[in-house]
Amino acid sequence: MTAPTAAVLLIGDELLSGRTRDINLQQIAQYLEPLGIPVMECRTVPDIQGEIVAAVNALRARYTYVFTTGGIGPTHDDITADAIAAAFGVGISEHPDAIRDMAARYGAMNTEFTPARRRMARVPHGASLVANPVSGAPGFRMENVFTLAGVPQIARAMLEDIGPRLKTGAVVCKVTVKGRGLREGDLAVRLGEIAAAAPGVSVGSYPWYRSSDDHGVALVARSVDAGALAAVRSQLEALAASFGVKPEIEV
């Protein structure tokens, strides 16, 4: 059985201009990792339909799942739903369940359900809805493409409705060995040897520097094989200790 994979497509001019800092990639990847679904690629595209269509079609052909964020709000530049419909070659219209739920929600708030708000009930033909417990306007699923809101709080809430629909893979275990005061260049040769001897384990090094008194290297190992991971962990701890550093462990 082929292990499932995922890609994330971030949509929005505000991301590319630097006005908005993305955190959706991080939270999607963190949600999927315990399910055994690694994020293999991330792209960011502007609010241009042709760019969105091209990216969606490229990613959905390559990966098990694609998660898009952004562009499903009530304004003129929220064009993601139209772009997804174009990518799949289908029409788009208001979903009756979305209209019903949103009308009830706005009615309960004594807020007018305006034409602009109704735009958020439009989904490609054949799509199923993704629940939005935060603001009510749904996301949707079109085959292997899940379309989420750009607001991080809403996107994260939508993942809870998506999770049960996903085909999961082998759970990846992870261990982090932190060495304060270590320098990445001093570790490079030995770290490469450890990684080469354990092909079933992904080994990486991530330096940090917060101040002259708070810096070092985090050595991170990941694997679906708990035994192989334990062996690499021991070697990473020994590597840190060989420089007179007491390793700090995070699992």
Each model region followed by its residue ranges:
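An accessory alpha-helical subdomain
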Residues: 144-239
